């Protein structure tokens, strides 16, 4: 009888994120969508095609009413920053967005605290841009001819 051949397990060295030289910044794009119901923080590569991290305020708190709160946005932003550092992203461009269209053009309550938490986490911030969709000629707003009566 011959000895049974056993394969030794190969150890693969896996690195996350791009290969960069020392002292070079690796940029990602942080899309912050802050409505009055929730805050989405979505990190992509520079082209915007590949999602790296996506965390919402609703993933951080239990109560539905707290999804859009500044506290939930801050927790989400801290998680995003930690994950970005693991992936090797050291600098970010921020694209801030409100609901827009024929709805409100002002960002929700979580926008400012999310941005502040990203800045305090040690990420370098390149550009901050408002990408709220502003209609040039829109569909009719809801509320009827005489508007919303309080």
Swiss-Prot record:
Top-level division of the source organism's lineage: Eukaryota
An individual GO BP term: translation
UniProt keyword Ligase, yes or no: no
Matching Pfam families: Ribosomal_S11 (PF00411)
The keyword Signal is assigned to this record: no
InterPro entries according to UniProt: Ribosomal_uS11, Ribosomal_uS11_CS, Ribosomal_uS11_sf
PROSITE patterns given in the database record: RIBOSOMAL_S11
MF GO annotations: structural constituent of ribosome
Predominant cellular place of this UniProt entry's protein: cytoplasm
Cell compartments where the protein resides: Cytoplasm
A Gene Ontology term for the protein's cellular component: ribosome
Keyword terms, alphabetized: Cytoplasm, Ribonucleoprotein, Ribosomal protein
Family, similarity comment: Belongs to the universal ribosomal protein uS11 family.
Descriptive protein name: Small ribosomal subunit protein uS11x
């Amino acid at each position: 009888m011959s000895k049974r051949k056993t394969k030794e397990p190969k150890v693969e060295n896996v690195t996350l994120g791009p290969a960069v030289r020392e002292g070079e910044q690796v940029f990602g794009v942080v899309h912050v969508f802050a409505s009055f119901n929730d805050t989405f923080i979505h990190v992509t590569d520079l082209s915007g095609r590949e999602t790296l991290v996506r965390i919402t305020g609703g993933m951080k708190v239990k109560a539905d009413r707290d999804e859009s709160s500044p506290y939930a946005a801050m927790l989400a932003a801290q998680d995003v920053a930690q994950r970005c550092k693991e992936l090797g992203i050291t600098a970010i461009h921020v694209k801030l967005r409100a609901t827009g269209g024929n709805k409100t053009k002002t960002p929700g309550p979580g926008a400012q605290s999310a941005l502040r938490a990203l800045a305090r986490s040690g990420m370098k911030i390149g550009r901050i841009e408002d990408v709220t969709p502003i209609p040039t000629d829109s569909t009719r707003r809801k509320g009827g001819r005489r508007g919303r009566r309080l």
